[in-house]
C-alpha cells in the first residue's frame, strides 16, 4: 500500500481595491488566512486607480508571506486574474507590450506581482464583487478604510 503525500498547507488570500474617483484617492485591503488564523492588511495612496489598488492588495499580501507556500488568491478583479493567468506570458514575450504593440499599463506592478507570485504556488480565483461573499465584503471594507485613513492623514 502506498502513502500519498499530504496536501500542502494552503494560505487563502482575499483582496479588494477601491478608488474614490478613477483616478483619485484609493485604498486596498487583504485578508490572509492560514490554519484558521487571519491577518488583515490595508493601505492607500493618491492619486491612483482602482486597478492599481486591486493589484496592490494582492502584491502586499503575497509579499507578507515569509516562506514559499501554496496560495489561493480570491479577487473580484478580472483584470488581476486575467492579467496573471492569461495576459502576463504574452506581455513578457513582447517586451511588456500589448498585442497591439502599446506599453502595458501598470507594468511596474505587473512585474512586481509576477516576481511575488513566482515565489509561491498560486491558484487564482475570481469571485463576484458586492455579492455577499463575506471575505470579499471584508476586503472591500478594508480598502475603504485605506481611503479613509489616507484622507485623515492629508
Swiss-Prot record:
The keyword Disulfide bond does not apply. Binds 1 Mg(2+) ion per subunit. May bind a second metal ion at a regulatory site, or after substrate binding. Monomer. This is Ribonuclease H. One of its GO terms (cellular component) is cytoplasm. The gene is rnhA. Residues 7-148 form the RNase H type-1 domain. Belongs to the RNase H family. The lineage of its organism: Bacteria, Pseudomonadati, Pseudomonadota, Alphaproteobacteria, Rhodospirillales. It is found in: Cytoplasm. It catalyses: Endonucleolytic cleavage to 5'-phosphomonoester. It comes from Paramagnetospirillum magneticum (strain ATCC 700264 / AMB-1). One of its GO terms (biological process) is DNA replication, removal of RNA primer. Its cofactor is Mg(2+). Coiled coil: none annotated. Mg(2+) 1 binds at residues 16, 54, 76. Keywords: Cytoplasm, Endonuclease, Hydrolase, Magnesium, Metal-binding, Nuclease. Endonuclease that specifically degrades the RNA of RNA-DNA hybrids. Pfam families: RNase_H.
Amino acid at each position: 500500500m502506498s502513502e500519498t503525500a499530504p496536501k500542502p498547507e494552503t494560505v487563502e488570500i482575499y483582496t479588494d481595491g477601491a478608488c474614490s474617483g478613477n483616478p483619485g484617492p484609493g485604498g486596498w485591503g487583504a485578508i490572509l488566512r492560514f490554519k484558521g488564523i487571519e491577518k488583515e492588511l490595508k493601505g492607500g495612496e493618491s492619486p491612483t486607480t482602482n486597478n492599481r489598488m486591486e493589484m496592490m492588495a494582492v502584491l502586499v499580501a503575497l509579499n507578507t508571506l515569509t516562506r514559499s507556500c501554496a496560495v489561493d488568491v480570491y479577487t473580484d478583479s478580472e483584470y488581476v486574474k486575467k492579467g496573471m493567468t492569461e495576459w502576463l506570458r504574452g506581455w513578457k514575450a513582447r517586451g511588456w507590450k500589448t498585442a497591439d504593440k502599446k506599453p502595458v499599463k501598470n507594468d511596474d506592478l505587473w512585474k512586481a506581482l509576477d516576481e511575488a507570485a513566482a515565489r509561491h504556488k498560486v491558484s487564482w480565483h475570481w469571485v463576484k464583487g458586492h455579492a455577499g461573499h463575506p471575505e470579499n465584503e471584508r476586503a472591500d471594507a478594508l480598502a475603504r478604510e485605506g481611503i479613509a485613513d489616507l484622507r485623515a492623514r492629508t
